[in-house]
């Protein structure tokens, strides 16, 4: 069953180059790419660190991409300082820090001034890894790993299957804590991938991976479309999917500051359809959002650990169908339970995408407290759902989900 959790919980989309770009003459594509590269280089010319390292950097980082990269690096001294100034008052130097994709270490060097107990940096680019190794050589509290942080999920899965200690080797010195205690680790990074939020949600729902050490404190810099999707009040608002509803149920979060989107590489194309709803929210679409998020301290009192996966399945099933009516869905599992929910204000026409995350959570809590829940087919359906796919191709999918993002096709 553990193998299937990866296949069910982390969707691995296939990356295909657009046929229009592929059919254009090679000379035309090369000219446009070099122009975009020069624009990016010119943008960072005021950075002394960038000028020193630019000749040795992976050139693909300096090309705008069609798809969203999984790793994003900060190249701006000023925005690294902006991020540091916004989070340093929240950080506890006695709690280990994890930094994702530190790049040239602009933020890392600032974090080291806090005299932290430990910094674990995860960098997938070979040259940036060498830069970080040189920083670590003068700072014993800094340890650098060449890997994608998302691989902790698959490593945890393999540990469960063969009794290994892969996760412990990637997270040395992190002490396990009770849920109600202070966070076990502070995670800092930049991402434009909704997959990261799906990853953190799934770790809580399945009580595995990084969450097996206790709660984590997140400081994530994300595009505005991700933050404002999370911050939407109802599932009917644009682009809010089950992972965002569950994120609202599981986490408390706040916006700390805004930073320029061009301060990070690689630059990438953001689809107009995905950001169109921001026009109605009066927000700056060119500014990334630095957010702080912490799993709710009382979460396991509201939802016992044994029911977290059930909540994940309940939310996933309800919100991934375009128009799924709540009461017929509930009565599919427990017949004649509808009148109770009608008395709570629902109608037979209410669908899941009309509900806020708090309303959906309240419905779930009521649903699992019904006398017939333990004997209803809901749990059997959950088990069947988790075991629906076979085990073939797991390692290939894990590789494609992490290292497989290597060199996407650049765009104009």
Residue ranges with predicted function:
Residues 2-312, 375, 389-411:
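Catalytic cores of RNA-modifying enzymes
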Residues 118-119, 337-341, 374-378:
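Short, flexible/disordered secondary-structure transition segments
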Residues 233, 237, 333, 370:
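Phosphate/oxyanion-binding loops and surfaces in catalytic or ligand/nucleic-acid-binding neighborhoods
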Residues 247, 345, 379-381:
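Short, charged/polar low-complexity linear motifs in solvent-exposed/disordered segments
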Residues 286-297, 302-359, 364-368:
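An accessory alpha-helical subdomain
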Residues 352-410:
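Short, amphipathic C-terminal "tail helix"
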């Amino acid at each position: 069953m553990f193998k299937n959790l990866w296949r069910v919980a982390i969707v691995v989309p296939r990356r295909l180059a657009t046929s229009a770009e592929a059919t254009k003459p090679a000379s035309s594509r090369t000219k446009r790419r070099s122009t975009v590269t020069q624009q990016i280089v010119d943008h960072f010319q005021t950075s002394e660190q960038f000028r020193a390292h630019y000749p040795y950097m992976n050139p693909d980082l300096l090309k705008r991409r069609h798809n969203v990269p999984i790793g994003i690096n900060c190249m701006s001294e000023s925005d690294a300082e902006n991020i540091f100034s916004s989070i340093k008052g929240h950080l506890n130097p006695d709690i280990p820090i994890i930094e994702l994709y530190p790049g040239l270490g602009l933020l890392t060097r600032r974090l080291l001034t806090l005299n932290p107990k430990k910094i674990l940096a995860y960098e997938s680019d070979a040259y940036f890894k060498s830069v970080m190794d040189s920083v670590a050589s003068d700072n014993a509290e800094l340890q650098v790993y060449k890997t994608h942080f998302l691989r902790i999920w698959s490593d945890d899965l393999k540990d469960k299957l063969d009794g290994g200690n892969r996760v412990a080797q990637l997270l040395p010195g992190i002490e396990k804590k009770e849920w109600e205690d202070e966070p076990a680790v502070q995670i800092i990074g930049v991402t434009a991938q909704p997959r990261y939020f799906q990853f953190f949600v799934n770790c809580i729902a399945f009580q595995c991976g990084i969450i097996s050490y206790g709660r984590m404190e997140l400081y994530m810099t994300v595009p505005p479309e991700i933050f404002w999707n999370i911050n939407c009040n109802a599932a009917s608002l644009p682009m809010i999917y089950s992972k965002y509803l569950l994120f609202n149920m599981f986490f408390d979060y706040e916006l700390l500051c805004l930073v320029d989107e061009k301060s990070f590489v690689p630059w990438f194309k953001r689809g107009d359809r995905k950001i169109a709803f921001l026009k109605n929210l009066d927000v700056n679409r060119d500014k990334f959002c630095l957010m702080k998020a912490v799993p709710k301290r009382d979460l396991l009192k509201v939802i016992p650990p044994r029911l977290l996966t059930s909540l994940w399945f309940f939310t996933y099933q309800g919100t991934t169908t375009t128009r799924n009516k709540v009461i017929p869905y509930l009565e599919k599992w427990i017949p004649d339970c509808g009148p109770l929910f009608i008395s709570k204000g629902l109608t037979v026409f209410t669908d899941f995408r009309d509900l806020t995350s708090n309303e959906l959570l309240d419905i779930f809590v009521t649903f699992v407290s019904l006398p017939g829940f333990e004997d209803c087919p809901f749990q059997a359906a959950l088990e069947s759902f988790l075991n629906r796919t076979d085990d073939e191709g797991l390692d290939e999918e894990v590789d494609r989900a992490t290292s497989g993002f290597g060199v996407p096709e650049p765009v104009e």
